[in-house]
Amino acid sequence: MANLVDPTNVRTSGNGWYSKYNIYLFYTYSGTPNYVHFKTNVSANTEKIFMIEAIGYNYGGASAIRAAWGVYTTGGGGTTPKGLQTIAGLTADGVYTSSDGYACIRAYAGSLYFAGWILNAHVHPNYSVNISITAASQNSTSGNYY
């Protein structure tokens, strides 16, 4: 269902990268379920500002995919959306904190039949972090999955 890919790092900043391309590759041949959840390695107990974007294709939705999740982890255990943007093919449906305290993003599409996308991460230089995706699941959960 999903494969990890080697990321391409762009411009280091202290303990992380400003941008990381191809942090995760997701693809599916199944049209349903319609939600996909991604769990990051970013703890909600640290104050971080970052954006994750999805770029790809959605054959079942007859559209290119372009979506983005702006995320702020509060440092107090919370994860707050700071701009969810959907251009086409996949809805940036939400952000949340996992049960074990990590930032997660949720995507939705009316159909995921032959859909695939890469995730890229962009971090504010003052809040650098080496972002990775630690888990992904295609399911029917519209709320918090992790």
Task: Mark where each language-model region is.
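Trimeric viral appendage architectures of receptor-binding fibers, tailspike depolymerases
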Residues: 1-146
